[in-house]
Structures are given as C-alpha cells and as structure tokens.
Amino acid sequence: IGIEVMREAVRVLETLEHKHALPLEFVMFDWGAEKYLREGVSLPPDALEMLRREFDAILIGALGDPRVPTNQHAVDILLGIRFGLDLYVNQRPVKLYDARLCPLKGRNELDLNFVIFRENTEGAYVGAGGMLRQGTDGEVAIQEDVNTRLGVERILVHAFEYARGRGLKKLCMSDKSNALAFGHGLWQRTFREVRERYLKIESRHLYVDALAMEMLRDPSQFEVIVTCNMFGDILSDLGAQLAGGLGLTPSANIHPGKT
C-alpha cells in the first residue's frame, strides 16, 4: 500500500501548504521494492549523507512487497535511515476520528486520543546475537536486548517534555522488569529518577501485559505512553487497530532538533 498511501499523504501536505502558506518543497525518490528488484539496491551509497545535508524531513510510505519475501529493501531503508540518522524517537499518535472505526463496543472519539513514544534505536532490534550448532538438534539462537542509560533517559525525557509542552497530565511507562531484570531494571531506575523532574505530571508504571489489557479495557485513561523498542512496536499497532487500522495512524521517527 506504500504507493497509494504516499499519493494521498502528498495531497494532504499540498493542501496544508496552500492553506497555511507553508514553504514546502518535495523531492521524490524511487527507493522501494521496484528499485530493489530492478537493481538490487535499497539505498544509494550516499543516501544518508545526502538526506542529512539537504533535507529537513523524510516522508516514507508503507514498505513491503510479496516479491521480496525477506523484505530486505524495507529493512535496509527503514533501519538504515533510523540508525544512520539516530532517530531515537518513534512517535505514534493514536486518535479515533470516527466511532464506527473502533472495534471496541461503546467507544467514541473522546475515548481514544493518546500518543505512544517508542525508543527507536536500542532494545531487541539492534541485531545483536548469533547462532550455535545451526542445523542440528542442539541448535541455539541468541538474540540480545541492548539498553543504555543514554538511550533510555533521552526517550523518557522526550516523552515527559512532550506531555509538559502540551499541558498533558498523565504519562505511563511500560516495561517487563519483573522478567527482564537487567535491561528493564535500567528502565525502572531511570524512570524513577527522571519522573522527579516532572512532579506536575502524574506518572505511573505498568507491565506491558497489563498495559495491553488496559488499552482494551479503558483507552481513555492514557495520554502519553513511553516504552522500549519492541513493546512500542507491538503496542502502537494495537493502538492503530483501535483507531481504525494502520492506514489511519501516522508514525514519526525523530531526532529532536535535527530530523
């Protein structure tokens, strides 16, 4: 759906450009499945430096094509840009525009309006790990989950600053520290320290399984949610479905002050 989504997204931006006199300049690139299948190239060698030097924002449609079973082009583009430009904030607003789109019974537009902040450069998605005795009955697969104090603190601070800047009163941090004692223990300790800087915001913690249940039971209780990479990936898609589907829920990958 990438091409179709992009076509409509550009129409919206062009409307905003004319309505609000925004000085937008669009440059289109053919990066996607067609280019990958034709040339075997996902991103040109100088793509990241060119994007960093010449552009303020990057608009990407949905990536994926059954002709590329491994989705290698999508991995190269999304993760290449995300890690290459250190886009550590993934911001996923969840807003219901029409009650008929929500699968939950008796919910209306006022019940579903929150934002999920997902740490975007660490966790289980860094690609660290390996295989032992591959192809044997004793095969072992190891996938490492990497969390740093810098990475955890900066996404927590960004979420709190977002809440404060918009006059929001409630923030929920989610992890699984009862089972992932080391990595998510770091999330717990850092959260307790950072929340002391924002005492006017009602902040609380929920384990991710409890949070998923609460999002279904009463989504109106949430304003800002912040969590790790993998949990944010899952929860934001759950939120998207509550709002009517992925086609209605945008996603922004951000390095505040840069991209």
Each predicted region: which residue ranges?
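N-terminal beta-loop-helix "entrance" segment that forms/cooperates
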Residues: 19-45, 213-215
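Glycine-rich phosphate/diphosphate-binding loop of Rossmann-like nucleotide-binding domains
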Residues: 1-11, 15-19, 136-209, 221
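Short coil/turn connectors at secondary-structure junctions
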Residues: 22-24, 53-57, 86-87, 109-113, ...
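Glycine-rich phosphate/nucleotide-binding loop
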Residues: 214-259
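N-terminal glycine-rich phosphate/adenylate-binding segment common to multiple enzyme folds
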Residues: 35-142, 230-232
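Short, small-residue-enriched loops and turns at beta-alpha junctions
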Residues: 66-67, 178-182, 213-214
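Short acidic loop-to-helix transition motifs that present clustered carboxylates
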Residues: 99, 206-213
